[in-house]
Amino acid sequence: MVKIKFGISSSLHPEKIPAPEEILNFAEQAENYGYDSLWMGDHIAFHGHYTDSLTTLAAFAARTSKIIIGTAVFLVPLRRPAIAAKIAATVDFLSGGNRFIFGIGIGGEGKKEFELCGVPVRERGKRTDESIEIIKKLWTGEKVEHKGEFWNFSSVSQTPAPLTKGGPPIWIGGRSDAARKRAVMKGNGYISYLYSAEKFKEGLTKMHEIANKTKGILQIEEGLWTPAHHSFIFCHKDEGFALKSGIKNLSRRYNMDFSGIAEKYLIFGPPEKCLEDIEKFKHAGVKHFVFKHAGPPEEELDQLALLSEEVIARAKN
């Protein structure tokens, strides 16, 4: 049986750009506190301050030794697939292999990002599907060709290939039926975002149905396909303060008012309440949690310790 894993995502910094050493220290501390995985979100131009996801993960790999690193999620349609394949393969290579998960999604909430990159928003799904096909071809390290709607090439290879046999696992993020189908048909896992436990269970049931009709069972317990959940979390003894802080964080992050819906998607409050919420997701089928700090930015490092010692250690037991 697959053991449930717990990861942490480096948070968006809505007000100030952190010093480089702060970002790298976060990675070291995540490994020191025993987290299974370390993640980066991805945006080209969004609300707040983001470093580039794959470049930052390469730096994380150099400052750590064994923690899994991953993108949650990399916005594939904003890049040419050959460039994405090359950089992702390099991250896998430099991290030593079997440490990198390439979480990808189609994006869309940041319309200006698509304008900036010259990509029509309406094409993002089709571009993602074709990009996955190209990336997998290029990761073989062999000479390959491709004829598609957006890209065409012949007799081209990229080296070095990823050290991970077959390439890094690709997890598909999203909340739509199309994303779930993409995760089953083209991915090695699925990662939900802004979901309730009930919605996650419903989505996983649909993915099992898709798999049974097309490719057979999802090999979850064999560790070959992973249902994951990305959740904002703020563990604090004062439940009201935790919720208020979470609303403020999410509202800044997305430049919209989350006061009416934050409670539905946040894990917040004292350790006991956070554990109860995590248990709901475990029963819904989550095998890998990716937490992102939803409280005041200055408390992010303190949360690393608190979550590890008071929540995750107990959730694993």
What are these regions, as identified by a protein language model?
Residues 1-317:
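Active-site-adjacent structural elements that line small-molecule/cofactor binding pockets in enzymes
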